[in-house]
Amino acid sequence: MHDDPRYRVEVEVSPRFLAHQSTPDEGRYAFAYSIRIQNAGAVPARLIARHWQITDGNGRTEQVDGEGVVGEQPRLRPGEAFHYTSGVLLETEQGQMQGHYDMVADDGTEFIAPIAAFVLSVPRTLH
């Protein structure tokens, strides 16, 4: 995180359950999450890497780190946004994800864009 408001990136996440890609009898629950990353600062910046902590309903945690997102390292001008969708498989009906993106501004300043925890959950239906 960087306290200077010139280096600020906002992240919004919309998760959803993918019933057609899940096989609950085999302990496979598929979720997609759509992400909107917006440069809310004053300096253009590039997303360099991602860091995720994925926790299932049994408390098992997995760390996932990698370069960029969906094969890209998008550069965002002030006010510009980048959207992408990705997915995750859990062995339980619910879990959560949280993490951060490593960013580098055009002036060389490195900072972190936090991704607040969000819930992955199979929707309940009433019969």
Curated annotation (Swiss-Prot):
One of its GO terms (biological process) is error-free translesion synthesis. InterPro entries: ApaG_domain, ApaG_sf, Uncharacterised_ApaG. Residues 3-127 form the ApaG domain. Signal peptide: none annotated. This is Protein ApaG. The gene is apaG.
